[in-house]
Amino acid sequence: VKQKINLYTKIAPCGCLNSFEDQDFLKEYKYWFLALNWEQGFLGRSLLFLKTHKTDEIELTDGEVLEKHAVYCLWREAITKAFNPDKINQAQLGNEEYLHRGHLHWHFVPRYRRPIHFFGMDFQSDNEETQKLSYGSVHKRAVHPADIRQKIKEEILKYL
């Protein structure tokens, strides 16, 4: 297991993302990096962070936009092979800017319309009513143990 010491400082030298040390780093790209969200109510929930300070999509360069799309497609393929979600929600809210201090980011949230189990745990799935709602209104906020997140990370990285 690789240590995460100073990892976020290396990726974003401004230090703004140091509070995200509990996020499980997945992969670094030129402009972005992927991290597993510590809240795994929906199995495979991930974050895509911009390395530089920008708070709105209109500020992105063409290179950043193209890479964001490419990374999403790579992640989508990996998450499909790993867990086969029925749908993906994407969200870019920016409501907690005090946490990331202006690093634009997206939430990638796999949704499942069937019971989903992994590594001996049950994860959140949708029923007919909840599948119509945004993930923010139905997800269960719970930090999952590091060993579970590590197994999820390993499964995604097999395909990423």
What are these regions (language model features)?
Residues 1-54, 150-160:
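Active-site microenvironments that recognize anionic phosphate/pyrophosphate groups
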